[in-house]
C-alpha cells in the first residue's frame, strides 16, 4: 500500500496549486482529522472544508514543493516547502506533514508541523 499511499499524498499536494476547494476536499474521508499544528484541530469534512476555505481566502497562488517522502504502509510523511501568495504577501514555509491513508486511498488524518513564528514574520 505504501506506493499507492505516496501517490495519494503527492496528488493531494499537487491539487492545492489549482486553488479548487472541491478537488482538495475530494481526498478526505467524511470523518477525517486535520491538524495544522500549532493551530486548532479540524475534525470532520465540514470543519476541514471551512478551514481550507479560510486558508485559500485571498490566496492567488500556492505550491507544495515536496523535498522528501517516506512511507510505511498507509502512513506517509513528507518534508515540504509550502509557498503561497495571499493578501499581497509571499510566504515560503518549511513544513513536515504526516498523512494517514485509508485502504481505498482517502486521507483520514493529516498533521502538518511548522514554525508559527516564521509564518507570522512573513505575513506582517
Feature annotation, model-predicted:
Residues 1-30, 122-124:
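Short, low-complexity N-terminal intrinsically disordered segments enriched in polar/charged residues
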Residues 21-73:
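A solvent-exposed, acidic/Ser-Thr-rich amphipathic alpha-helical stretch
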Residues 24, 72-75, 99-106:
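Short, solvent-exposed coil/turn segments at beta-strand boundaries
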Residues 52, 64-69, 81-82, 94-100:
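Hydrophobic/aromatic beta-strand elements that line small-molecule binding cavities or substrate pockets
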Residues 78-86:
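Short beta-strand segments that buttress and anchor functional surface loops
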Residues 98-121:
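Short beta-strand edge/turn micro-motifs at domain boundaries
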Amino acid at each position: 500500500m505504501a506506493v499507492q499511499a505516496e501517490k495519494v499524498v503527492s496528488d493531494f499536494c499537487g491539487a492545492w496549486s489549482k486553488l479548487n476547494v472541491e478537488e482538495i476536499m475530494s481526498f478526505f474521508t467524511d470523518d477525517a482529522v486535520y491538524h495544522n499544528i500549532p493551530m486548532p484541530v479540524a475534525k470532520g469534512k465540514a470543519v476541514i472544508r471551512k478551514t481550507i476555505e479560510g486558508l485559500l481566502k485571498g490566496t492567488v497562488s500556492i505550491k507544495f514543493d515536496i523535498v522528501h517522502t517516506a512511507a510505511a504502509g498507509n502512513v506517509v510523511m513528507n518534508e515540504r516547502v509550502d509557498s503561497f501568495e495571499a493578501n499581497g504577501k509571499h510566504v515560503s514555509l518549511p513544513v513536515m506533514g504526516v498523512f494517514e491513508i485509508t485502504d481505498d486511498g482517502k486521507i483520514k488524518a493529516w498533521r502538518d508541523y511548522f514554525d508559527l513564528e516564521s509564518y507570522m514574520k512573513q505575513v506582517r
